């Protein structure tokens, strides 16, 4: 696994996330796939308490899916407004699902409130435009995250190290979008030339 996350849940429970190459998916197939995942975490030398994770008992489901984006250009039609995953979702590598949904709810509810106050039909164009740009920025952020976190081999490791040093030195890039919100970064953080400079050899 090139990228993994461990989330303590309280009461001695953990939620584990791991990324693996499609070529390795058979390693996590079959009825014992949960035990295989726990075993993979146990082999991570960099993970504190890896032995304790290996000795744990799986209690939840094992879900595996490919990381990708899905969206529609206009999540509205007469009498209907789609929000959250129904309107399209971001590659889960940067964990934005709930944040996207909550922002959608806020924007749509404000439009509905304002239309009711003005006794007029709601105009969802601002929501459609804002969401399109937000999702575009998150799509770019997820693509960079995938390149840095989930590509495999020595070249990928070297690229991660270079990019990490550049980010630590203050070089502009899109990675903070998943922490502070994509709208809070300047537009140039998402320009192709910015990404190229961040990932360059």
Where do the PLM segments sit?
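Conserved mid-domain beta->alpha element of the FAD-binding
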Residues: 61-144, 148
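Noncatalytic linker/hinge segments flanking ATPase motor cores
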Residues: 19-24, 45-62, 105, 121-128, ...
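Short secondary-structure transition/capping segments
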Residues: 21-31, 95-98, 161-175
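Generic detection of long, well-ordered alpha-helical segments
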Residues: 27-35, 102, 124, 153, ...
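Short linear sequence elements within intrinsically disordered, low-complexity coil regions
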Residues: 9-12, 22-25, 67, 129-132, ...
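Conserved FAD-binding catalytic core of PHBH/FMO-like flavoproteins
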Residues: 1-63
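C-terminal helical "tail/cap" subdomain of flavin- and related membrane-associated enzymes
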Residues: 110-201
């Amino acid at each position: 696994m090139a990228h993994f996350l461990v989330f303590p849940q309280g009461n001695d429970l953990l939620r584990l996330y791991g990324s693996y190459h499609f070529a390795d998916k058979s390693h996590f197939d079959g009825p014992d796939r949960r035990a295989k995942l726990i075993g993979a975490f146990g082999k991570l030398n960099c993970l504190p308490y890896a032995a304790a994770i290996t000795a744990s008992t799986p209690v939840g489901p094992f879900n595996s899916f490919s990381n990708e984006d899905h969206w529609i250009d206009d999540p509205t039609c007469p009498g209907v407004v789609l929000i959250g995953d129904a309107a399209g979702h971001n590659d889960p590598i940067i964990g934005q699902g709930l944040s996207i949904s909550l922002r959608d709810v806020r924007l749509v509810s404000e439009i509905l409130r304002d239309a009711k106050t003005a006794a007029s039909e709601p105009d969802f164009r601002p929501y459609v435009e804002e969401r399109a740009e937000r999702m575009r920025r998150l799509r770019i952020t997820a693509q960079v995250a995938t390149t840095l976190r989930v590509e495999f081999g020595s070249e990928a490791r070297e690229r991660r190290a270079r990019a990490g040093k550049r980010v630590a030195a203050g070089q502009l890039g899109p990675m903070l979008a998943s922490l502070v919100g994509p709208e809070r970064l300047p537009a140039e953080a998402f320009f192709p030339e910015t990404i190229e400079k961040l990932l360059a050899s």
